[in-house]
Regions:
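Short Cys/His-rich metal-coordination motifs, predominantly Zn2+-binding knuckles/fingers
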Residues: 5-7
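Extended alpha-helical scaffolding segments
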Residues: 9-170
């Protein structure tokens, strides 16, 4: 059975490369790989060490490569990238706005961020889930440095509380 989905299928012996992660090779890096014998377990080689079907492997590598290619779904720093996505495509730019600057005043995200900066929650319905992952490259390998999931409402409450705590009295 696939360790992620529980489906029965053909297991992926190797995983496709994830590209555009700082620190990884220009040709990409692997999130999952077991090349040296020291990393093999109980005589299992390559993808036998993590039970993931070809379908699941294709889905996660394609999704990460898309998020890293699309500027609205990631931020790149010297030592890594942050990717983000949501159940609601209109809310996906939230993390980029929060970390990387604000949009134009006529855009809905500007209104949301403006309310958060004043310590108020936005007056909008929010999607169920929001996801943020930090990726770092090291030659041919990629590691997940953090993974955060919450409701967007929960994430906004945390950001709002942080901004209120950081507020300086004049």
């Amino acid at each position: 059975r696939d360790a992620i989905t529980g489906e029965i299928g053909v297991f992926a012996p190797v995983h496709q490369k994830i590209k555009r992660v700082p620190g990884a090779r220009p040709t990409g890096g692997s999130l999952i790989s077991f090349k040296p014998v020291a990393f093999q377990s109980y005589g299992k080689k390559n993808g036998e060490n993590i039970l993931m079907t070809e379908h699941t492997q294709f889905a996660y590598t394609t999704a990460l490569n898309y998020l890293l290619m699309d500027p609205t779904h990631h931020l790149t720093f010297k030592n890594g990238s942050i990717v983000f996505w949501s159940d609601d495509p209109e809310m996906e730019p939230f993390a980029k706005e929060m970390i990387g600057g604000f949009s134009k005043p006529e855009e809905p995200m500007y209104q949301i961020m403006n309310r958060l900066l004043r310590g108020r929650m936005p007056r909008t319905s929010l999607p169920d889930r929001y996801y943020i992952a930090g990726l770092r490259g090291n030659a041919g390998r990629i590691s997940v440095s953090f993974f955060y999931q919450d409701t967007l409402n929960g994430l906004m409450k945390r950001v709002s509380n942080h901004l209120l705590r950081m507020k300086m009295d004049s």
